[in-house]
Regions:
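Catalytic cores of carbohydrate-active enzymes across secretory and cytosolic contexts
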Residues: 1-295
Length: 295
């Protein structure tokens, strides 16, 4: 108990999702089997270890319960999510009202230096002055943005968009080959993703395919979507990327829905789902798309 407390007072636990599939749990028998030797070395019983991961009425070892008991500061990733998490985890503090549960929140943000491209960094260094990246929350820091000549601003954006489209074409070509698709079909899929003519309005949606992120909201009204995507005078390209947790069946169903709509003849080449989502691809998408879709 003293060792757990010593660790807990220096530990912060951030819970990221309300989706049950994102909270791992394992059979107590598995925990006993793999941790029996460690328990003997530490001088604790199997029961003491298992108690750290139990939830009331449960018979499995819950990793979220372990993290809660092994920390003294707990937070969600937005004000609403903090409240939702407090209610979800309320069984761990049955003696405390939900509104008083020790789960607070932080507001998720973006680490600018990680996701901003080197091209934008160089441009901002010239026009916003040295040290701007340390003052991104200071409104006055961004007054210099209006002094950037339009042609320079647009040139950087179009260059990054072309780089992104090169990567999109490469990845779509690879996944098309894995699926034994024809060259003619590939040409139709990539007709709008043209890095030599990056003037098609390109909209990106890339994140985990969890139901509450509403990846399928765009497809609730297909007639409205047709009006947007089937105007030859104003071509639009939607790029989807992301992964679902292996145990999240509804999340996987969302991916299948995106593929289903993308395969409709009228949407061919106008909605692309790019496989193999990772941080490298995320950076390219953030830098290259015209609009970031957030449902």
């Amino acid at each position: 108990a003293a060792a757990v407390e010593a660790v807990a007072v220096h530990t912060v636990f951030t819970t990221h999702t309300a989706v049950p599939a994102g909270h791992d749990h394992f059979s107590e028998e598995m925990i006993r089997r793999y941790f029996e030797h460690a328990c003997k070395e530490l001088g604790v019983s199997n029961e003491q270890l298992l108690a750290l991961g139990r939830v009331p009425g449960g018979h499995e070892f819950n990793m979220t319960a372990l993290a809660i008991r092994g920390s003294r500061f707990h937070n969600g990733v937005s004000r609403i999510h903090g409240g939702v998490s407090a209610r979800i985890l309320s069984s761990l503090w049955p003696q405390i009202e939900a509104d008083d549960k020790p789960v607070t929140h932080v507001t998720n943000g973006v680490h600018v230096s990680t996701f901003l491209s080197s091209e934008w960094n160089e441009l901002f260094d010239r026009f916003l002055g040295p040290g701007w990246s340390q003052r991104v929350t200071d409104r006055s820091c961004w007054e210099g943005i209006h002094t950037i000549p339009d042609h320079q601003f647009w040139s950087v954006h179009q260059s990054l968009k072309a780089q992104m489209l090169h990567l999109v074409r490469h990845r779509i070509s690879e996944q098309h080959a894995r699926n034994h698709g024809s060259e003619a079909h590939l040409d139709r899929l990539l007709k709008l993703a043209n890095p030599d003519n990056p003037n098609v309005l390109t909209i990106g949606f890339a994140r985990r395919f969890a139901t509450y992120k509403r990846a399928g909201l765009l497809f609730e009204n297909l007639n409205w979507l047709r009006e947007i995507l089937c105007n030859p005078q104003r071509p639009v390209l939607f790029l989807f990327a992301g992964k679902a947790h292996p145990a999240d069946q509804p999340g996987q169903a969302l991916i299948r829905r995106v593929i289903e709509v993308a395969r409709m003849p009228e949407f061919e080449g106008k909605i692309l789902l790019v496989e193999g989502y990772d941080l490298r691809f995320a950076r390219r998408l953030v830098s290259g798309v015209d609009v970031w879709l957030n449902n």
